[in-house]
Swiss-Prot record:
Name the UniProt record assigns to this protein: Transmembrane protein 106C
InterPro entries in the cross-refs: TMEM106, TMEM106_C, TMEM106_N
Keywords, alphabetical: Endoplasmic reticulum, Lipoprotein, Membrane, Myristate, Transmembrane, Transmembrane helix
Subunit: Interacts with TMEM106B.
The keyword ATP-binding is annotated on this UniProt entry: no
Amino acid sequence: MGSRHSTYAHRPFSKRRKADDTEDSLAEREQQEAIAQFPYVEFTGRDSITCLTCQGTGYIPEQVNELVALIPHSDQRLRPQRTKQYVLLSILLCLLASGLVVFFLFPHSVLVDDDGIKVVKVTFDEQRSLVILAITATLKIRNSNFYSVAVTSLSSEVQYMNTVVGSYTTTNISLIPPRSEHLVNFTAKAEMGGPYSYVYFFCTLPYIGVHNVVVFVRTSVKISYIGHVTQSSLETHHYVDCGVNSTAV
C-alpha cells in the first residue's frame, strides 16, 4: 500500500516538469528564430571597438558615425507637426516684407512750387538807357518719398515781351531729406534796353510811385533719386518794381 501511494505522488510532479521543459524549449526556439532573423555579427581587428549597446562582448566598426539609419516612411519624425502652418506663416512674412520694401522704395512724386520773388535789386545804366534787374526768386520743393532726393540742376529764363532778357543755371544744388520741404533760392540777372529802352525812361520817372513791369519766368528743375531722374518745369508771371530796390515781406 505504501509503495503504490508513492508512485501516485510522483506522477503529477513529473507531468509538471515535462510541461516546464516544453515551455523552455519553445522559448529557446523563439529566441533562436529571432537571432536567426537578426544575426549578431562580430567584427574583430584593429578597426573595431567594443559594442556599447549590445548584450555581449562583440565589436562594431570605428566608422560607426558613418552608418546610415533607415527610417520607415510612416515614422512620425518624418511628419513634423504644424508644417503647413509654418510654411504659410513664412509665405505671409515674405509677402509682408516685400510689400513694405515696395511701399518704402516706390518712387513718390516730388512737387516743385513757386514761392514768389523775394528780392529785386535795380541798377540803371544811363549811357545805354539800360535797366538791370537782379531778381531773387524762391522755389518750394516737397519730397514725399521715404528717402532723400537730390536737386541736380536748376535753370531759369526771364522774358519780357516774349524776349529772353536774362537767364540763370546751376548744378548740384542741395539734398532734400525724406518727407520734408526745402526752399531753393536763385538769382537771375535781367537786362532791359535796346528795343526796350523805353523801360528805362518809365522806371526813372520821378512822379510815379510804383514802376511795375511784368516779367515771365520759366524755371526747370532736375531731381534724381534711386537712379531715377525727373524734371519739373514752372512758368509764372511776376510784377516787378523797376524803380527802386524791393524786398518781399
